[in-house]
Structures are given as structure tokens and as C-alpha cells.
């Protein structure tokens, strides 16, 4: 299951970085997508911090594109650290926005983060289309076909541990 989560978060990082790269010179579109993008990335950062029991860097939900790029890459590295150092069945305790204390497994938190990305990425893609732009393809299966084609073409071995 850890290999699966590593692959899923590699996909999210790749797609997030590709989306940001494709929009970096479109200031009009960035005004529409930065709130959703930064919210998703900060939420990921906060969940990582909850699991790792560390402090977060940003208190607000609106960060620049450059900060989104850096934070997304750091989030990916921290998620890999979580997967390497924690058991998926471990329980983490956290307080929600209404100050209610909950406990969830690392597995459930990571699955939630993944779904959260997918939800807001759909909104981001809809905004891009609404602006008359064809967005990059963000489907997981498309990514898998692309990465597998790349690996086959360049004879790259997949490391699964």
C-alpha cells in the first residue's frame, strides 16, 4: 500500500507542477486558480505537519505561484518521509477548525489529501476551460500511460520499495 501512495503522490506532484508551469505566464488565469491551488497545497502541508508533528510555514490560504511550486515540492518530499517513517495504521490526533479533537490513521489522512487534490484540481481545470484555454490532461490513467511509455522508451527500471 505504501508503494501505491508513493505513486499517487508522485502523480499529484507531477500534475501540480505541470499545471503551474503551464499557467505561469498567464496572470489573468493565475488570479482565478491560485486561490484553489494554494488552498490545496497548504492543506497538504498542514496534514503533513499533523502527521510529522511539526509546525507549518504559511498561516493564510493565498500564496504566490513561486511559493506554491516550492511548497508542493516540499510537501511531496515530506509525504515520502511519512511513508518511509510511519506505518499506515498509525493513529494521529488533530483538532479541526471547530476545535474538535479527532483521531485518524495515516492511511485515512493521506487518502483524504489525495481526494482533496483531485476535487480542487477539477475546479482548477474547469476555471482554465472557462477562460478559453485547453488545460493539460490531468487524468491519472493518462499519467500512468505517459510514465510507463517514458520508462519503456528509456529502459528505466521502476523501484518499488
Show the residue positions of the predicted features:
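Short, contiguous alpha-helical
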Residues: 6-59, 100-161
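Helix-adjacent hinge/juxtasegments
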Residues: 56-96
